[in-house]
A protein has these predicted regions:
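N-lobe entry segment of adenylate-forming
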Residues: 1-48, 52-67, 71, 152-180, ...
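Conserved AMP-binding/adenylate-forming
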Residues: 43-48, 61-106, 255, 259-264, ...
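Conserved adenylate-forming
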Residues: 67-69, 194-211, 215-260, 282
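AMP-binding/adenylate-forming catalytic core of the ANL superfamily
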Residues: 106, 114, 125-129, 307, ...
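Gly/Ser/Thr-rich phosphate-binding loop
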Residues: 159-164, 175-182, 305-308, 320-382, ...
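Conserved AMP-binding/adenylation subdomain of ANL enzymes
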Residues: 235-257, 265-306
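Conserved ATP/PPi-binding loop(s) of AMP-dependent carboxylate-activating enzymes
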Residues: 388-392, 404-438, 475-477
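Conserved C-terminal "lid"/linker of ANL adenylate-forming enzymes
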Residues: 470, 496-499, 509-511, 533-592
Length: 592
């Protein structure tokens, strides 16, 4: 059947099912039945078939129920991307409970706030995490802690120890002190997995769970919030994204082995890195990492066909240089959370070429509230093109005040309409939220906070993010747009523009990480500063040009691997206070 998405997608993908009553468990059971002999998960040396995965989920569900977990209960899973978390998400959904996912190195302050926010009664953590969190457990709603081990599941049923596994040290020390009122159990004792599905596969499962998966929403620790996603929303997302994830299989006839560099505690990480992959029969390569260095271990260990990551984590591969063969197995990179600059893409392609590979780099645009809504294939010529809507999703460029369409080529706010929204509430409940509006066409539209435009080919361009938008004089200023202009300058590795108060009013200062060699030659550094200013004069309106350039060895990142704006601003202000008036802002690199 012809549809407006047939212009962009093959007919068999252009009309996805945009409504479903399947639970997560039902969806994964369907995939396991369809692909029984395919490998579903790889974790270290262990490979789990889809047929075995279903057995393990059924047994895990029975064990959670035996522990006392009931419909509506919340279990915190803090160990990251490993089989314990994956099995538990689907098993908890089967019995009507919810999985609250979070980063494995969450601070104690946020751990307490998040646990209380979601009213968690149970928590799965490693020995090392227990050492960090045991002292604050009594401040939370948690009553039962289950200790899991990274190394146990990394080597599977064999008893061979993989000492080089980066997180082996997190399996110690063994818990000694148990706070009063807390029950402590061990995963291997409470969840004996015998892969015997006949015992549990026909046990009843709950079909009315409106908050299957919970995520920590960025906020103050004392006022934590959670993003709640239903199974229906996640399953529709899997339908709309199927073509993106099956592209390799469509070309080769074989499922792809995909490594997600995003922790499952984030919407993009779980949805695109685990659930959507399993839903369409691909192989998920599981890896939990606490810092960027471990990314390279995972790539070398698994030799994946496809990498999935945020733009920050994927771009960190560039730092390893063109002499590396890190991408020798990789055919495709799927980037979410922002667009790569042309220089970042060029470096990735160069690294791939040095390994004798032809690399494809595509993008997925989305947000926690709507999951993913746009797809940008690798052959887009402009690095400002976010591409076109995923199948089943409507996009438009609207006036942010009136909600009406703007003329072709004019700038406005990117707005999105997707049937996923209806799973979050009624029309009245949605329109009470700040980003949702009912427009004259009768549909509920989500205002994304991104400024964009659309050309005559119905392609969407990202102009800038409204976050941190300010006005200098009467001109709207988008710091993210400044960053993009600066990063086009040769020698710039990263850039982040901050708004700083001065006696003359708000000014822009761009924090820049240059290539390493610039720190050893002051004349090179000053030449780079001049070239950045020239690029900004060429590309940006006068009000959008930074008043100064500050050079740093590195920029602080948050747990998603994304530059932390507030921390950068603090760093810039501190450097300003240390440098004499009239001197250039340059951080002194640490001594070797």
């Amino acid at each position: 059947m012809e549809s407006q998405w047939s212009v962009f997608y093959p007919e068999n993908y252009a009309n996805p099912v945009t409504d479903t009553d399947e639970t997560l468990y039902m969806r994964i059971k369907r995939a396991c039945t369809r692909y029984p002999d395919r490998i579903a998960l790889e974790y270290g040396a262990r490979k789990i078939l889809y047929s075995t995965l279903l057995s393990m989920i059924d047994e895990t569900a029975a064990s959670w129920k035996k522990l006392g977990v009931q419909k509506g209960d919340v279990v915190m899973l803090v160990m990251g991307n490993n089989p314990i978390n994956v099995l538990s998400v689907y098993a908890l959904d089967k019995i009507g409970a919810s999985a609250a996912l979070c980063v494995p190195n969450l601070s104690t302050e946020y751990f307490v706030g998040y646990a209380n926010c979601v009213n968690a009664k149970y928590c799965v953590m490693s020995c090392n995490q227990y050492l960090n969190y045991s002292s604050v457990l009594k401040e939370t709603t948690i009553k039962t802690v289950i200790i899991g081990k990274y190394r146990e599941t990394s080597v599977g049923i064999t008893k061979v120890k993989v000492l080089f596994y980066p997180l082996a040290s997190y399996d110690t020390p063994r818990p000694r002190n148990v706070p009063e009122g807390i029950t402590l159990k061990y995963w291997k004792d409470a969840f004996p997995l015998n892969n015997n599905s006949t015992t549990h596969e026909n046990s009843p499962h709950d079909r009315d769970n409106n908050r299957t998966v919970l995520y920590l929403f960025p906020s103050l620790a004392a006022a934590c919030k959670a993003t709640e996603l239903s199974a229906r929303a996640l399953n529709v997302s899997a339908n709309t994204a199927e073509m993106v994830l099956k592209a390799n299989e469509d070309l080769t006839g074989k499922p792809a082995r995909m490594l997600c560099l995003n922790e499952s505690c984030f919407t993009f990480g779980f949805t695109f890195g685990i659930h959507n992959l399993l839903s369409c029969g691909q192989t998920v390569l599981l890896f939990t990492w606490y810092n960027a260095d471990k990314i390279f271990f995972a790539i070398r260990k698994y030799k994946p066909d496809v990498l999935i990551g945020y733009n920050g984590t994927v771009a960190s591969i560039n730092k390893i240089g063109v002499s590396s063969d890190i991408l020798k197995s990789v055919d495709r990179i799927i980037v979410g959370g922002g667009l790569l600059t042309s220089s970042q893409k060029a470096m990735l392609f160069e690294i791939a070429r040095s390994s004798g590979k032809k690399l494809s780099v595509c993008s997925i645009t989305g947000c926690d509230e709507l999951l993913a809504y746009a797809y940008g294939p690798s052959d887009l010529q402009s690095d400002r093109l976010i591409g076109f809507p995923l199948p089943g999703i409507l996009m438009r460029i609207s006036d942010p005040d009136t909600g009406l369409d703007v003329p072709e080529g004019a700038e406005g706010e990117i707005t999105v309409c997707t049937l996923i929204s209806k799973f979050f509430g009624s029309d009245e409940e949605l329109t009470a939220m700040p980003n949702y509006r009912k427009l004259p066409d009768g549909r509920i539209w989500y205002f994304t906070g991104n400024i964009g435009k659309q050309d005559g080919n119905k392609m969407f361009y990202l102009v800038a993010s409204k976050s941190r938008e300010t006005r200098i004089g009467s001109y709207p200023v988008y710091p993210s747009k400044v960053d993009e202009a600066v990063q086009m300058t040769e020698g710039v590795v990263e850039a982040c523009t901050v708004i700083v108060d001065s006696p003359e009013g708000a000014v822009l200062i761009t924090a820049v990480v240059p290539s390493e060699e610039y720190f050893f030659d002051n004349s090179l550094m000053e030449d780079l500063r001049d070239r950045i200013k020239s690029e900004c004069e060429l590309m940006l309106h006068e009000a959008m040009r930074p008043s100064d350039i500050a050079f740093f060895v590195s920029l602080p990142k948050n747990s998603k691997g994304v530059i932390d704006y507030e921390a950068v601003k603090e760093k810039v202000e501190m450097l300003q206070s240390e440098v004499n008036i009239g001197e250039n802002l340059t951080e002194t690199p640490p001594a070797d």
